[in-house]
UniProtKB/Swiss-Prot annotation:
The gene is leuA. This is 2-isopropylmalate synthase. GO terms for cellular component: cytoplasm. InterPro entries: 2-IPM_HCS-like (IPR050073), 2-isopropylmalate_synth_dimer (IPR013709), AIPM/Hcit_synth_CS (IPR002034), Aldolase_TIM (IPR013785), LeuA/HCS_post-cat (IPR054691), LeuA_allosteric_dom_sf (IPR036230), LeuA_bact_synth (IPR005671), PYR_CT (IPR000891). The lineage of its organism: Bacteria, Bacillati, Cyanobacteriota, Cyanophyceae, Synechococcales. It catalyses: 3-methyl-2-oxobutanoate + acetyl-CoA + H2O = (2S)-2-isopropylmalate + CoA + H(+). GO terms for biological process: L-leucine biosynthetic process. It holds the Pfam family HCS_D2. Residues 408-540 are annotated as: Regulatory domain. Its cofactor is Mn(2+). Residues 8-271 form the Pyruvate carboxyltransferase domain. Its EC number is 2.3.3.13. It comes from Synechococcus sp. (strain CC9605).
């Protein structure tokens, strides 16, 4: 059997695989804020990014290693393809963390070997020990992944895994890269690895899976029953295509059904010892932070963290819950950090009160950021009687979300009505502080604002999504606007909140434009899609 740490290790890849969601790109400060909250949540490993992809990705992983990694903190991990350049960049990026890991991978399925890598099985069997051994010479903790393991020939998979462990891999990850397998198949795959890889006892078995068929969480839970002891997942299940296995669903399934899973860990059924180290009361806070910073809205009926997860509409259900919550609720909402209690702030609230509440919500702002957030808070408090947690989250998300500003919105004015043609006048500041003003007409005030901004910026793009939601209840609620722009096949999101949704739309559009410009300059590699040259392999 594989090495058993006695519980399930939670490997969070929100900052790497989760960020690959279309339009979910994060800047350095956003990544740092999420990493700090993941540490509070109690995850075991944070995969902070793909350091070789770009200088920005390298800097983000390095900064997280410096500020979040610690002797008692999470392991800080970076992803690297099976190449010396990737692995060396990864080692350098995670070096500041006392507990660090290199996660390297290569595909093992025939379809990937033939069409993506153009390599033979023999080539892969030569590359794996060489690259794992090189990674192990740089760090003590090396994870190796067999990309597309779910569609790989099991016998070949066993050979590759055995070679990786012999070369020094301490964790073996089995990805269902395209979300193809069913729970019984995935469980059998893990069981087969335990049975047929002679040295599997020297490594922890990890699993990684995508949700293309909606089976990722079910697959993982079946894998746990068959010996997997590390689960690679993301907050809110975000990720490429249909997303990844959801951290909150996995953790709460193991928490609520602990008596069922305990025997698979050799425990008594009634053992009260948690199966993960996650602090479940931090789940809701973490979910909201990730949603706010990525702009990926959580669907209302999403398990555990959706707005309706603890709501009851049916009269029969409401009656039952009022008499005894256990009639229709298997989870106490407070267990995941959802509470009806709230501290309302207003225009008389001071800086210390705002700072304290932000810290409780998971935001650790610098003095400069706090000053700006407090100024924004006071401005909002003049227009809105009561400032709620969701208002604060919107303010700070907007604050820390700002990419390096190529453009800055100074003025928005609109005229519209039933007998008027919607017209907008906007003023933009460029990075040198020069002002330009322009006007445009549109089908509505928001369309007019976006057209005017586009004309001034001169950055070709296609607006593919505009959405607005109310941050809180009431007629004075802030409107949270998300705008997504597309250019050269890449998506860029902008978000902003204001009590005036037209102003918020202008701010969100400029935010998206700044991200687009920064993204064009960044030109990141994609770990699974970009080619790699292996310097030491003459046949490649």
């Amino acid at each position: 059997m594989a090495k058993d740490p006695g519980r399930v290790l939670i490997f969070d890849t929100t900052l790497r695989d989760g960020e690959q969601s279309p339009g979910a790109s994060l800047n350095l400060e956003e990544k740092l804020a999420i990493a700090q909250q993941l540490a509070r949540l109690g995850v075991d490993v944070i995969e902070a990014g793909f350091p070789f992809a770009s200088p920005g990705d390298f800097a983000a992983v390095q900064r997280i290693a410096q500020q979040v990694g610690g002797d008692n903190g999470p392991i800080i991990c970076g992803l690297a393809r099976a190449s010396r350049a990737d692995i060396k960049a990864c080692a350098d990026a995670v070096a500041p963390a006392p507990r660090r890991r290199i996660h390297t991978f290569i595909a093992t399925s025939d379809i990937h070997l033939e069409h993506k890598l153009r390599k033979s099985r023999g080539d892969v069997l030569g590359i794996v020990p060489e690259m794992v051994s090189y990674a192990r010479s740089l760090v003590e903790d090396v994870e190796f992944s067999c990309e597309d393991a779910g569609r790989s020939d099991p016998e070949f998979l066993y050979e590759v895994i055995e070679a990786a462990i012999a070369a020094g891999a301490t964790t073996i990850n089995i990805p269902d890269t395209v979300g193809y397998t069913t729970p019984s198949e995935f469980g059998a795959l893990i069981a087969g690895i335990n049975q047929h890889v002679p040295n599997i006892g020297e490594a922890v078995i990890s699993v990684h899976g995508h949700n293309d068929l909606g089976l990722a969480v079910a697959n993982f839970l079946e894998a746990v029953k068959n010996g997997a002891r590390q689960l690679e997942c993301t907050i809110n299940g975000i990720g490429e295509r249909a997303g990844n296995a959801s951290l909150e669903e996995l953790v709460m399934a193991l928490h609520v059904r602990r008596r069922y899973y305990n025997p698979f860990f050799g425990r008594e059924e009634d053992s009260p010892t948690p199966l993960t180290a996650v602090r479940t009361e931090e789940i809701t806070k973490t979910s909201r932070l990730v949603s706010n910073l990525t702009g990926m809205v959580v669907q209302p009926n999403k398990a555990i963290v959706g707005a309706n997860a603890f709501a009851h509409e049916s009269g029969i259900h409401q009656d039952g819950v009022l008499k005894n919550r256990l009639t229709y609720e298997i989870i106490d909402a407070q267990t995941v950090g959802l509470s009806d209690n709230r501290i309302s702030l207003g225009k008389l609230s001071g800086r210390s009160a705002v700072r304290a509440r932000l810290e409780e919500l998971g935001y650790d702002l610098t003095r400069e950021d706090l000053d700006e957030a407090f100024a924004r808070f006071k401005e909002l408090a003049d227009r809105k009687r009561e400032i709620t947690d969701r208002d604060l989250e919107a303010i700070v998300s907007e604050q820390v979300q700002q990419p390096e500003a190529r453009f800055q919105l100074k003025l928005v004015q609109v005229s519209c009505g039933s007998s008027l043609r919607p017209t907008a006048t906007v003023t933009l500041l460029d990075e040198e502080g020069s002002e330009t003003t322009g006007s445009a007409v549109g089908t509505g005030p928001v369309d007019a604002v976006c057209r005017a901004l586009n004309d001034l910026a001169g950055v070709p793009n296609e607006l593919i999504e505009f959405s607005v939601k109310s941050v809180t209840e009431g007629i004075d609620a802030m409107g949270d606007v998300t705008i997504r722009l597309r250019r050269n096949g890449a998506l860029y999101s902008g978000h902003a909140a204001d009590t005036d949704v037209v102003v918020a739309a202008g701010m969100a559009f400029v935010n998206a434009l700044n991200r687009l410009v920064a993204g064009e300059e960044r030109q990141s590699l994609h770990p699974q899609k970009d080619p790699v040259v292996l310097e030491s392999r003459p046949t490649l």
